[in-house]
Design a protein with these regions (language model features):
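Short glycine-enriched loop/turn motifs at secondary-structure junctions
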Residues: 1-2, 62-67, 93
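N-terminal beta-strand motif that seeds the catalytic metal site of vicinal oxygen chelate
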Residues: 1-16, 68-70, 120-125
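Short, conserved structural micro-motifs that define repeat-unit consensus positions
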Residues: 5-7, 39, 69-71, 98-100, ...
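Core segments of cupin and vicinal oxygen chelate
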Residues: 8-47
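A short, acidic/glycine-rich surface segment
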Residues: 35, 54-59, 119-120
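Mid-chain, well-packed structural core segment of small domains
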Residues: 63-88
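Vicinal oxygen chelate
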Residues: 81-125
Length: 125
């Protein structure tokens, strides 16, 4: 099994700039009468972004049952944090550095840093 894509609903076009700062590139755009669908890609990961100001705002707290957040792996947290406002960098249970940020509509997005292991020299997540 593999992940095909992640679908997001955003309230305005300006949200695309956030994902572009993470390295996503717009690949296709479909203008429909009631919304716009933008397909963005970064390193083989596809985002399907629905731009529609008529959807209700996300319930932000307390968190409800369902999807909690999405996480992207980046080369360098410091590099991303030059362009994107994030929380402080922390370390998870496995020793990986991570942080959280939000797009302009506010859903939490986790950023994890790629890490080289001295044992095998290969990158892992």
């Amino acid at each position: 099994m593999e992940l095909d894509h992640i679908a997001l609903i955003v309230s305005k076009e300006e949200n695309l700039a956030f994902y572009k700062k993470l390295g996503f590139i717009e690949k296709n755009r479909i203008e429909r009468g009631y919304d716009t669908v933008v397909f963005m890609e970064c390193d083989g990961l596809l985002l399907e972004v629905f731009i529609d100001p008529n959807h209700p705002a996300r319930v932000s707290g307390p968190e409800a049952v369902g999807l909690c957040h999405i996480a992207f792996v980046v080369e360098s947290l410091e590099e991303v944090m030059r362009d994107v406002e994030c929380e402080e960098i922390r370390t998870d249970w496995f020793g990986r550095r991570f942080t959280f940020c939000r797009d302009y509509d506010g859903p939490p997005i986790e950023l994890k840093e790629k890490k080289n292991t001295p044992e095998d020299g290969e990158k892992n997540r």
